[in-house]
Amino acid sequence: LYDLTTLQREANRYYGFTAQQTLDLVQTLYEKKLLTYPRTDSQFITDDMEDTARQVISIVCRQLPLFSDVSVTPDIARVTDNSKVTDHHAILPTVQLEKQDVSALPQSEQKILNLVGMRLLCATGEKHTYAETQISLSCEGYEFKTKGKTVVQNGWKSIEELFKSSLKTKEKDDLAKTLPEVHEGDVLDGVSASVTEHFTTPPKQYTEDTLLSAMETAGNDQFDDDTEKKGLGTPATRAGIIEKLVKSGFAERKGKSLIPTKDGCNLVCVLPEQITSPKMTAEWENTLMEIERGKADADAFLSGIVRMTGDLVKAYPFLS
């Protein structure tokens, strides 16, 4: 199911919405009582919500025209895990959707409802199963291998494909190779080969989709396993961080890409690594967890921050 960050990422990929636009839309739908609380970092629901989830799935199929022909036998257990729900469960449509004329909503809100509805149906739908075949070929002492897939049961993929077919910009799926029927020991005649030349390409510029993913996982290897908050920012603040960079002139949008400006590049060059590395964020979060457990002193932590700030101001006076 969707937490806020994953919803923001997919809304950017499918619709081109910025993280802030998605946050504003889900907040509006929450205030209209059509979506549950949006600022969540959980992708699961609790076991006491099973009946409600079944009811919501039926409502989604009745109320959202895109899914009117969908018939599902939901497996709610796949999205139920009490241990993975903290303050708030995953984002879901609410039972109030039953009373809503969806066609009267703005197109942008309808798109978010379709996205959240699709995720719920896919997450609880029938399993997608396929048979994978691997062929090994021997030629002139060299061994060549290839793989192909044959779909046995499309399952939840059919719902995802239905959703993607409604998009103006079609998503490209990875098409598995269809292999011819062969048997062990077959000899293939008339096989040809050719050489093609390819060049490495530089990494792609960040989109809000990929930047949100990077923020979510930044410095994770530096955090203790049981630290509650990891990465840069929280689901509720990451959109604001991106918008602040754009409004401050340190980044700009070009199509779906986020590009650092000259001022942004210069800022990163002059800032000390201590500030630009996610390691400091990890250290602070780890210490805050220790304070919560009574294993570290809050006053000493604050004094350390004050001391570090003073040292940085002295070492880099031009930044103040």
Question: What are these regions, as identified by a protein language model?
Answer:
Residues 1-25, 33-34, 207, 227:
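C-terminal accessory/connector segments of nucleic-acid motor ATPases
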Residues 19-20, 24, 41-320:
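Basic, low-complexity terminal or inter-domain segments flanking catalytic cores
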